[in-house]
């Protein structure tokens, strides 16, 4: 835990950006969930005891799957793949976009407490926002009409948003941030990706 606190103090700017992004994701999710509740004529609180317990369970499963990541053979070594979004997607379909964002946040928080960070929070921020770019649109679409057909459409919408956002986020923020963190020219990082 001391190592994590030391990393936080050394990377205050990234931590502040991370916190601002978390707040932004929560606000978007709240607006979408309230809109879906209004359209469907539902008036239940965003959080209740049952939801909080389920958020904890889905987050724990997601964190375990997140820790069991593996490298992608066709990408640079710092890109990893895991299946941690699956339980979060199921949980957000069941409990809404706000619960999905909360699960993403708790997953990353648990991972940081157990494993720490090796990327000065850059990779953790990336995992959170790219995960939210899948979870928020998918669960929002599904929240408006909970049918099998709409679940498929929601997954397609979430995948499209995640792909477009993830690509842009990599180009505009992540790759330059990794370049700065590792002290490598951006061209060298891009060359690592094109080598494979």
Predicted regions and their residues:
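Loop-helix junctions at membrane interfaces
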Residues: 1-196
